[in-house]
Amino acid sequence: SHGFAFNFAHYSMQPFYNDHTAYGAAIALLIPPIAYYLIYGKDLGFGKGKMIFVITLLAILITGFVLSYSRAAWVSLCAAFGVWVLVKSNIKLKTLIYCGLVMCVVVAFSWGRIMGAFEKNDQDSSGNMAEHISSITNISTDASNVERLNRWACALDMFKERPVFGCGPGMYTFLYGAYQKSYNLSIISTDSGDLGSTHSEYLRPLSEQGLIGLLTNTAVFVVTFVIGIRAYRRTASKLLANLALFATMGLTTYYVHGFLNQFLETDKLAVPFWGLTAVVVAIDLYATKKEKQAEKDNEKQLLNSEK
């Protein structure tokens, strides 16, 4: 019996997942949609049995989510909740964009101080929740974080060498070893560079497909997010509108998680991710169709009234 030991979290999900971070990312992706059915289940006509099932399922997911010890997943779910707060506050999309730009400028000007604070943090990953959260910003001694920075540095060097078209789709895994620098290596680095990916959904296309790949990949995420918010605001049905919002929240968890890890090449993340993307787009198309139908009906009424 391992109980809830921290070290056991790294392989307790096997054979279904090969990594606890992928497991955490998948749960984070699903929690908002399941929460939707808990909140709006009665409006959807769910009986007592269905509601008990939803509550049980959500409780299991949250328990697994916490015990996954995936720091990136924890951060991503907080970001999704932030989206819910902002949307429910009825803040205009333009305002959000301006605020985001201002934050980017502030971070850019404060980058030296931020990195200095991160470098002073020596708290490693731990079974203690508070210490584990604190280790998120440890870029000096935490092996996982240091190795992540190593992979990112390799990706950026590969991009600098081939900025337009990159080194080719799927080639990062086979080539990054040659781009490793001794001062970037961690205790879990390998000389041959045979252990994986960029740890980023944004830097992988940048290194493999150049600037075009990064822009294309990011555009898909941004457009889907905008469509999700638009679907929420233009859909007349409260239930459909909130389904679009909670599906967008689920996707947001991975948009954020994608800065720190990269799992879309696996079926276990790709299926729920693109499934939620399809839900968001379908609701937006439905809302567009309803709007056009309403316009036609109004035109007919005007013509009839003129007669």
What does each model-found stretch correspond to?
Residues L44, M51, R230-L245, L251, ...:
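A juxtamembrane structural motif centered on a specific transmembrane helix
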Residues G210-T224:
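Hydrophobic alpha-helical transmembrane segments
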Residues L67, K88-T141, R151-E161, P169, ...:
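A membrane-periplasm/extracellular boundary helix in multi-pass inner-membrane enzymes
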Residues G41-K48, A117-G127, N138-I139, S182-G193, ...:
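Short helix-coil transition/hinge motifs at the ends and kinks of transmembrane helices
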Residues I39-D43, N90-I91, F118, D122, ...:
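Membrane-interfacial segments
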Residues S1-F8, Y17-N90, K94, Y98-C99, ...:
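Alpha-helical transmembrane segments of multi-pass inner-membrane proteins
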Residues N7-A9, Q14, I139-A153, E161, ...:
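Long extracytoplasmic/lumenal interhelical loops at the membrane interface
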Residues S1-A9, S76, G127-A130, S182-I187:
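Peri-membrane helix termini and adjoining interfacial loops of integral membrane proteins
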